Every structure is written in C-alpha cells, then in structure tokens.
Curated annotation (Swiss-Prot):
Cofactor note text: Mg(2+). Can also accept Mn(2+).
Swiss-Prot/TrEMBL cofactor(s): Mg(2+); Mn(2+)
Protein name: Acetate kinase
EC nos: 2.7.2.1
Species the sequence originates in: Mycobacterium sp. (strain JLS)
C-alpha cells in the first residue's frame, strides 16, 4: 500500500490539514477548519473531485480535529484505511535547541509549551493540535517540523543583535527566522525549474502571505532573513508591524500607559496592513484604492505604500549582501497571486539587472513560472510554496 502522511498546521483560530503521498508528492486531500471558537465556524475538505463542507460551531482545537476526521470519513477517505504512516506537525518556534525534524514525546510537548513566549500566536495552538492528534492516533509516530530550522546556522553577523551580550546569551536572544520550510522548499524548486545546481545560485526569496518574510540565500544556504527572535520583525504583514523602533514600545509603555500585553497584542493583531488600512485582504485593499470613499482610499493607499516601501528596502539590502543575484522568487498567497505587488516591488530596478515582463507578470498561473523579461540578467520567478509536502517528506526521513 502507498504510504501517506497527515500534515497538521494549527493556527490560533484555524486548523489546516492535508493528506499527502510523500514519495510521489501527490495531495490526496486538503482541508481547513476556520474560526475555531466562534459561532461562525466552518470546515471544508477537498478530496479528489469531492468537496465536503460543515458549518456548525467548533469550540476548540480538539473539536476541530474531530471535525477534520469526520470530513475525511464523509469524503470516503477514512484515515484508518489510507496507509497512514505518520502525522506531521508544523511548529513555528523551536527555540535554541530544536532545529531538526523531531519525533514527538511528552517531554517535547512540555518543551514546546515552554517556548510559547517566543511565538505566542503560533506555538500554543500547535501544542493543542499535537495533543489532540496524539490522542486520536496514539500508535502512529508524530513528528514536529520547525519553521526556525532552516535558519539555525545563519552567519553570526546576521543572527546576532547588537545588545548586551550577556543578556543575549542568558536568554538565547538571536535572529531565529521563520517560514524556513517554505524558503528552503521554494529555493530548491527554483534550482530545479532553472535546471542548475542549487549550490551555484544566489537567491532572494520573498514569502508574502498574511505573514511575510524575506531571505537571502547563497549556494543553498541562507545568509540573512527578515524575521528575528519572533515572527514580528521585518516586512510589513497582514496584522503584524514588522520593523519598528524599540523606542516606540518604551514610549507607549511609559507615556501612553499601555501594558506589555496590550503592546504585544497591538503589534501582532492591530498593526501591519490592517492597522493602517483596516483590511488584510489585498484584493479588498486594491478595490478601496481604486473606488473607495476618500478616507478608505487614503488609508488603503498608505497601507499599500508602506508595505511596498518596506519590501523594496529588504530587496535592496539583500542585493547588497549577495553582491549579485541570480534569482528573485515570489511565493505564498500575496507573492503568488498579486501581480501589482510584484510589479511595484521591482519597478525601476532595471539598472540593478531586474526587469519584469509585464505580460508574464499579469498572467495568472498555479504552477512555477518565469515573469522576468528575456533580457533581464536576474531571473524573477513565481513558485507556489508547498510547506505541507516538505513537512511530509521530513516525517518519513525521521521515522
């Protein structure tokens, strides 16, 4: 029987799940439970040509897992009869010591709970998903795959913050980086697409989704990335601020009377594109820029301009770090689907060797493709990320 892996990605209010054949790369089923804990919870699963949906309230992550398993049964893909060999879990933060795909036991779950302060939006729901899945599949191996793993060996100059070194060492403060599974997968796919050795390429990878990060990759090894100790640093994101002067936080605490928890919530949930433009969906943002009322239009335009400005700054910085860049890759929801973001991120860079083909950039596609002009010294690609497949393949290597 063909072996399969169930991959779980537990968010703060959602559970994504996918059943994959790691050997062939085929996705057998793909689903999501959304708005966990709300009255408007919904769940859906696509399995082959069948789509199954549910709309009843899902109170917590354990219930979300039960809902997911029920969807598989309803779609005729009972998890007990599909050759399931492992369950893979995306875990955002592995801290200083966890940077390899790791078999999950009770001690590891306790360790992941202790790392919650480093990724408060991501690690706690991952632990909930792990606990529920281990209860549902006690006889299967469960494997944690860490977002931070790919960036574990960043050069010291990139990983080190210029703060008191004793404090950094005592509290393991460094640039950890995130979306590592995606950055690694996409950079490897770029080499395959171009049919050249990964070791020969210098790349800038732009993972632009609700969370967003950039990386500079030389010969298959990352030399810098935009996210830091936590997933809040770097690019402007859907609800996260990205780079911000630390003095702003001290000012808000000391002068505005905000608590640490209030500041953290503001930075994570009420900042970024939503904080400036009131919306995280770029399709809506573009609509407001084109046809919203004056206030909505101005706010949306500012949010978009700040987003693009920050993105261009990081691209420029990484061009300087790499010296020369063979490939720039766009991936994730915004990177794969928003032609305007790609155009504006790279406009005016012809003298730096980066030229887009307007027609190719505007042409939608769900497969890897080149969008740079034939005359462009730097190749620009759009490559769909597939973190779930990368996690599934990491699982079978461990077990």
């Amino acid at each position: 029987m063909t072996r399969t892996v169930l991959v779980l990605n537990s968010g703060s209010s959602s559970l994504k799940f996918q059943l994959l054949e790691p050997d062939s790369g085929a996705s057998l089923a793909d689903g999501i439970v959304e708005r966990i804990g709300e009255d408007s919870s919904s769940a859906s699963l696509v399995c082959g040509e069948r789509e199954v949906t549910h709309s009843e309230r899902v109170p917590d992550h354990e219930a979300a897992l039960r809902t997911a398993y029920g969807l598989f049964d309803e779609a005729g893909a009972e998890l007990g009869s599909v050759g399931l060999v492992a369950v893979g879990h995306r875990v955002v933060h592995g801290g200083p010591d966890l940077y390899q795909p790791t078999l999950i036991d009770d001690a590891l779950v306790d360790t992941l709970e202790s790392l919650a302060p480093l990724a408060p939006l991501h690690n706690p729901p991952a632990v909930l998903g792990i606990r529920g899945a281990r209860k549902a599949f006690p006889d299967l191996p469960h494997v944690a795959v860490f977002d931070t793993a790919y960036f574990h060996d960043l050069p010291a100059a990139a990983a080190t913050y210029a703060i008191d070194r004793d404090l950094s060492e005592q509290w393991h403060i460094r640039r950890y980086g995130f979306h590592g599974t995606s950055h690694q997968y996409v950079s490897e796919q770029a080499a395959l697409f171009l049919d050249v050795p990964l070791s020969s390429l210098s790349q800038i990878v732009l993972h632009l989704g609700n969370g967003a990060s950039a990386s500079a990759i030389l010969g298959g090894r990352p030399i810098d990335t935009s996210m830091g100790l936590t997933p809040m640093e770097g690019l402007v994101m859907g609800t996260r601020s990205g780079d911000v002067d630390p003095g702003v936080l001290v000012y808000l605490w000391r002068t505005a009377g905000m608590s640490v928890d209030e500041i953290e919530t503001m930075l994570n949930k009420r900042s970024g594109v939503r904080g400036l433009g009131g919306e995280i969906d770029f399709r809506v943002l573009h609509q407001r820029i084109e046809s919203g009322d004056e206030s909505d239009r101005e706010n949306a335009q500012l949010a978009y301009d700040v987003y693009i400005h920050r993105l261009r700054k990081y691209i420029g910085a990484y061009l300087a770090l790499l010296g020369s860049t063979d490939v720039i890759v766009f991936t994730a929801g915004v990177g794969e689907n928003d032609a305007a973001v790609r155009r504006d991120a790279l406009s005016g860079m012809g003298r730096l060797g980066i030229e887009l083909d307007e027609h190719l950039n505007e042409s939608p596609s769900h497969t890897a493709r080149r969008i740079s002009a034939e005359t462009s010294p730097t190749t620009v690609l759009v490559i769909p990320t597939n973190e779930e497949l990368a996690i599934a393949r990491a699982c079978v290597e461990v077990i």
